[in-house]
């Protein structure tokens, strides 16, 4: 009988590429895999369906906050969560109710599956994993983020609740993984157990051909994320462009938060405003294609939270896969890759616009240097930072130990 693994995503699968890669690897190895997600936004439901079409594993989505299938229950869940957050804000008392009533729906579905192993991938699914542990189901946790350290300190955020869940699940888990050596070291110091590291690299089979050499407008530079908003290094970029002649173009891909795009444009020097383009977020299936149409990738992560400082972002490894030279800020996670990347990744401080300008303009002014960096980036992805290599590290691929 096949081993049954349940991956607890608790999110839209189209926005959870690490789970997709994990499910692919496990199912290819002969494991029966089901991913348990959640519908938050109606417009992403069809994208989820497109992504899982033809997969060897099953995807089931529990109705989430804005799913019409929730009906009146959605209002009750949202009200309870709002009251729990208000209690935390006013009194400092944090509760699991802040994780949302949807966690109980996820647990009900998980219990019905009776998996041999359940793998948690988010703060909410940590709670599900803990409840499964109480019922003697084996669990694992993948810290694709350090969940309790994701946010800048907010009075109502349940960081202490999530930290307790992290400790409980990590203590009893069959195994734990995370996205960088820096994160593994930090988690190990806090909880006494060091997760294994699986970089969030991407399959070579999905890599498009790198872009041709720059044309008359100069190198095409790219910043990409799910959301376009403050605290993501864009203010650093705007200031850095003030130190450069407009010898290259910049594309920013992400869904603007409120009127942030307008505010950001006002910060760009006037000479640059026709050189900077903002594009709304793409389908996940289109991300690598748009990246590969550029020459330089901007990985301007900030160190305003421990999670942001310690993780290795998706975009950095996607840039390498697509043959882009990378300008990166010196967060602990990004330095971990940059140290091994030579000229393919150049690093500046998170508050050093002049340093960033020097990197960008240096590549724009020296095509040979840029081409060398791009070739090295592609080589690194082919030989080191690709999913074909990282997938082999997955503990779930090892035969289960006999009791």
Show which residues each predicted segment covers.
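Membrane-proximal helix-turn-helix segments that form the acceptor-binding/catalytic region
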Residues: 22, 93, 97-112, 127, ...
């Amino acid at each position: 009988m096949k081993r049954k693994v349940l991956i607890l995503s608790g999110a839209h699968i189209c926005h959870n590429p690490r789970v997709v890669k994990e499910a692919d690897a496990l199912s290819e190895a002969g494991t029966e895999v089901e991913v348990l997600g959640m519908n938050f936004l109606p417009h992403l439901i069809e994208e989820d369906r497109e992504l899982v079409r033809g997969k060897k594993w099953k995807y089931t989505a529990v109705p989430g906050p804005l799913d019409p299938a929730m009906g009146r229950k959605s209002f009750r869940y949202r009200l309870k969560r709002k009251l729990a957050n208000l209690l935390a804000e006013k009194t400092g008392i944090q509760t699991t109710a802040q994780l949302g009533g949807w966690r109980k729906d996820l647990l009900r579905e998980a219990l019905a599956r009776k998996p041999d192993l359940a793998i948690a991938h988010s703060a909410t699914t940590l709670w599900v994993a803990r409840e499964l542990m109480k019922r003697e189901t084996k669990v694992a946790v993948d810290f694709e983020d350090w969940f309790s350290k994701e946010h800048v300190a907010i009075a109502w955020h349940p960081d202490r609740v999530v930290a307790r869940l992290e400790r409980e699940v990590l203590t009893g888990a069959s195994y734990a993984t995370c996205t960088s050596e820096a994160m593994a070291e930090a988690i190990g110091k806090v909880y006494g157990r060091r997760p294994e590291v699986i970089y969030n690299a991407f399959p070579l089979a999905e890599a498009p051909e790198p872009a041709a050499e720059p044309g008359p407008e100069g190198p095409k530079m790219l910043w990409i994320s799910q959301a376009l908003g403050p605290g993501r290094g864009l203010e650093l970029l705007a200031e850095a462009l003030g130190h450069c002649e407009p010898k290259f173009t910049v594309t920013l891909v992400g869904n603007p938060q409120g009127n942030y795009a307008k505010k950001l444009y006002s910060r760009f020097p006037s000479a640059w405003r026709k050189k900077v383009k903002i594009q709304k977020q793409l389908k996940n299936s289109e991300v690598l294609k748009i990246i590969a149409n550029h020459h330089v990738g901007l990985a301007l992560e900030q160190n305003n939270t421990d999670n942001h400082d310690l993780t290795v972002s998706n975009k950095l490894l996607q840039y390498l896969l697509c043959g882009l030279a990378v300008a990166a800020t010196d967060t602990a996670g990004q330095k971990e890759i940059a140290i091994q990347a030579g000229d393919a990744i150049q690093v500046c401080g998170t508050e050093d616009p002049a340093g960033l300008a020097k990197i960008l303009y240096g590549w724009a002014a020296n095509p040979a240097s840029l081409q060398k960096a791009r070739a090295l980036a592609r080589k690194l992805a082919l030989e080191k930072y690709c999913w074909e290599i990282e997938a082999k590290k997955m503990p779930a691929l090892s035969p289960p130990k006999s009791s």
